[in-house]
Amino acid sequence: MKRDDFLAQPEVEAFIEWLAANLPVLTFKLRFKSSKFVPGGLTVDVQGIEQVLEHYRWKASWRDSHQSAVDSETWMQTQGSLRQLREWLSAGVHAGDEQQALQACLQILRWGGVRGAIPFLHRLAASGELSSYLKKMAGLMALDADNDLDDLSSVERFDSGLTKIHALLDLSGSPIYDSRVGAAIAMLYALFRQQWAGRGKPLLRFPSGGARGDQIRNPGAFANCLAAPQFSAIEYAEWARWQVRLGWIVRALLGRTGWFADQGAMPARCHAFEASLFMLGYDLRCFGLTPVPEAQAVGEQGEVSLRESGNSGWVPTGHPFGQVLSDYLAFRHSGAPDNKNAFVDWLVAEPRNGKTLSRATAQGYCFPFSIDEFDLFGRSLAVLERIVEGGEDGLRAALSGETLEPFTVGDERVSVCLVDVFITGNAYARAESDKERVDYVVNAGYAGTENSARTLMAVGRSVGKHFGLLDVQHLPTPLFEQFYQGCSLDA
């Protein structure tokens, strides 16, 4: 589908009209906990989308090509920071300079507090394909071109880091579509659907992702609000299409209003609108609604669980980490196609100790393979063998870094395996009995039940011992202390 056809749909037009009428008058209660991204927190009530931008906060730091620190926190500072990153990225990509393009991409991720895309970016750069891939994607995602959403089926990876890279390379105002922006627009759409007289299945099921803390980023947590599909449940290409769809909607909306006129031309106005959504999406309680107790999100097929709604603490899908890595290496040596479906087929067809895995169990074993964890599919055999071997070298290979940088927890629920190692190491360091450790994990809010706490620690032990972060007694090692120095889960 092309832009004009998309915007001509009655429900899309009605949603844009609803936004134009309601966004200036809605009141938002911004309540941010103190964190490294928002030092001191934020408590303010504002009316209207334009007023939200005045309270933009995202404390970040990255290093330019001369290794000088570039710091930002306010919207004005962030604009300057992103302008530098955009120029660096654009220069590298258009010159075909793979190393400059790669370094710009890595610093964009550092600014955004995300790291999942690092292995993918390194692989593209090593094969000399990074610049050409980003240029191809830029053409497919431009908001002012005659492109078709179907053409985005060629997207190889997409996550909260890559959306930032693609948005910064774009010149037409393409939004960064992360969990917070997705949550905000999904909430606005849910409110629109409550008031709209039209019928039929929801046309604009904007996806979102989970927060690192107890913030709500799925409208389905509120009574009679449509739940947002989770990033983990949709294809990479579909996530990219939602970035384009949202961009089309924002340009159409700003084209009929004077909002953010002081920001400059249309692309700058689009990014100001996106930044305001980013602030609203931190916690959807800002819309003034009270979440349903033990909320069950309302999905297209009825109720779905809290986990599917993106509220599952730091509980992973249980899996035997070391064994799955060894299985994957054997699978790669078999010569089968290197993708999830083929690996799941292989796992189901290979009995273990006389037992055959169910397909659901085999799919669960792929938890650490996603781009949100270690992005293992597509690794070279040489790198994979280092990862399977484990230890510090295996961890560096898994994280695609020549040196082991201190682990940081971003704003979203990603890197669950490594967070679980951190939680597990701390649990064993402070408590001697199983009950005390389980109580610690549950009381801290990392898991909701005793069983889920045990699943969390089982994965934490498995991953931690594999990479030498935990010893045989599951206690933190010197490598643990080095890797997690300064790490905090406070959100």
Give the predicted meaning of each segment.
Residues 147-170:
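Helix-hairpin-helix
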Residues 54-151:
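Long, highly charged, low-complexity intrinsically disordered interaction regions
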Residues 367-398, 471-488:
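Accessory beta->alpha helical hairpin/"wing" motif in late/C-terminal subdomains of nucleic-acid enzymes
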